[in-house]
Amino acid sequence: MFRLDGKTALVTGASGGIGAAIARTLHAQGARVVLSGTREAVLAAVAGEIAPDGERVHVCPADLSDPAAADALVSAAEVAAGAPLDILVNNAGLTRDGLAIRMKDEDWNRVMEVDLAAPFRLCRAVLKGMLRRRAGRIVSIASIVGVTGNAGQANYAAAKAGMIGMSKSLAQEAGSRGVTVNVVAPGFIQTAMTDVLSDTQREKLLGGIPLGRMGKPEDIAASVAYLVSDEAGWITGTTLNVNGGMAMP
Amino acid sequence: MSEIADKVKKIVVEHLGVEESKVTPEASFIDDLGADSLDTVELVMAFEEAFSVEIPEDAAEKIATVKDAIDYIEKQKAA
């Protein structure tokens, strides 16, 4: 089950921990994967680690803060892969945290641009072909804070909540063509950023997670692999909360 | 039939997968040719691409039949 042989997937933000894990998992399920991100050297390293022989793996760097980059990326990815995109995983994102009363417009706008407008443009670009081919899978990686909110992240939470509303709308627009659009909302994932927490901070954090541990990038990757599979063909417009039980919206 | 009419017809046949004989000038995309709202948007986008014209939203809304499309594109091309 959940095999992706013959499918081509574009994963943005593939140089990061979660993105790399998603790319690795989709590749392991048989998909041809195109890795995108801003850091070309890191992408190349991830690609080399996924498939040392370069089999079914391609690198297409892109800076999604440039509005023209999304269309260009989809074209470049299809050329690199030599096939139309069956799967889009919107994973790229960034944060510019700060309490609202001190948040600059620039920090609000940058997060909206990269975390919400760019995924929209990528969806729009891939949907044209998917609608024509009567098949396709889009999964966007949001965040638990898009559902619960979080002090210090008004911009990021708004962008991630926006991603959920956008995906529900696209799911309704594309449903009649067999294209599904879903969201995965991760909770706390163990990364370099959470590794530096103090023991007290960590204990407090874990106290709020019924499953008693932080998530691994692979926990997110597995849910993406499921949602992009043929078997998940009757699931659309949903948000899968992968957070150890920290929030149960 | 004009070259534009031929090309419009071909796009409609290809996109909606209907018999060529059904694509008469009076045929309505939605009522006669089985298109849904998404099809009509895709058709307009296909026309835009094929004829290198821009069809704004308010004009696109008025294109209901094959003849509407041909007339609009002929007018744009003549302008």
Curated annotation (Swiss-Prot), chain B:
Whether Lipid biosynthesis counts among this entry's keywords is: yes
An example of a GO molecular function for this protein is: acyl carrier activity
PROSITE patterns attached here? CARRIER, PHOSPHOPANTETHEINE
Does Ion transport show up as a keyword for this record? Answer: no
* A cellular-component GO term for this protein: membrane
Its annotated pathway reads: Lipid metabolism; fatty acid biosynthesis
Name its cellular compartments: Cytoplasm
Q: Which domain of life is it from?
A: Bacteria
Gene Ontology biological process terms from the UniProt entry: lipid A biosynthetic process
Task: Please report the PTM annotation for this entry.
Answer: 4'-phosphopantetheine is transferred from CoA to a specific serine of apo-ACP by AcpS. This modification is essential for activity because fatty acids are bound in thioester linkage to the sulfhydryl of the prosthetic group.
Positions carrying O-(pantetheine 4'-phosphoryl)serine are S37
| Domain Carrier: start-end pairs | 2-77
Q: What InterPro entries would the database entry show?
A: ACP, ACP-like_sf, PP-bd_ACP, Ppantetheine_attach_site
Task: Give the UniProt keywords, A-Z.
Answer: Cytoplasm, Fatty acid biosynthesis, Fatty acid metabolism, Lipid biosynthesis, Lipid metabolism, Phosphopantetheine, Phosphoprotein
Q: Which family does it belong to?
A: Belongs to the acyl carrier protein (ACP) family.
NCBIfam families named among the record's database cross-references: acyl_carrier, PRK00982.1-2, PRK00982.1-3, PRK00982.1-4, PRK00982.1-5
Q: What does this protein do?
A: Carrier of the growing fatty acid chain in fatty acid biosynthesis.
Q: What is this protein called?
A: Acyl carrier protein
Natural source organism: Gluconacetobacter diazotrophicus (strain ATCC 49037 / DSM 5601 / CCUG 37298 / CIP 103539 / LMG 7603 / PAl5)
Q: What is the lineage of its organism?
A: Bacteria, Pseudomonadati, Pseudomonadota, Alphaproteobacteria, Acetobacterales
